[in-house]
Amino acid sequence: MKLWQNLAAAAVLGLAATASAADAGVHAFTLNLNDGAPKKLADYKGKVLLIVNTASKCGYTKQYAPMEQLYQKYKDRGFEVLAFPANNFMGQEPGTNEEIRAFCTAKFNTTFPLFAKISVKGDDIHPLYKYLTTLPEFSGDITWNFNKFLVDPGGKVVARFGTRVDPMSEELTKKLEEILPKRQ
């Protein structure tokens, strides 16, 4: 009897944790910044986010430049780009967090938040990416570097863009403009 009670309690707690993530969206997660400091994504409540898995040795690495351009264009309207380096695809992000930061700063002069390297697929997938890739309307594994998730100010994912979608493309910026606060 005690076993069944414990199993029932565990199931309820598991559902509560899932419901909590569903209610809070991406704001339910905490990850480490590139320097190792923990960062609650709840700190970004009220802001529109573009979450991107990145790599320094990929044919799409050049997307760091339009990511920075997008960030500079919209940051004063409550927009953040969050970059998550990942080494899941052909070893294209082999560096340490320090090396990744140095590369992004020197090559692309990035100023948006850069997080510590994580896994975006497989058995060691980070819980944030597990959440992102199992949302019914945006489900599916991350298949390459520079996949993008657009998140509204409440933490809800509103769009997913593939690797080939340039951050400054009309497709992405049009959707971004729809959810950003209007200019006064």
Question: Which ranges hold each PLM region?
Answer:
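N-terminal "domain-start" segment that seeds a small globular fold
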Residues: 20-42, 127
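Bacterial N-terminal signal peptides
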Residues: 8-16
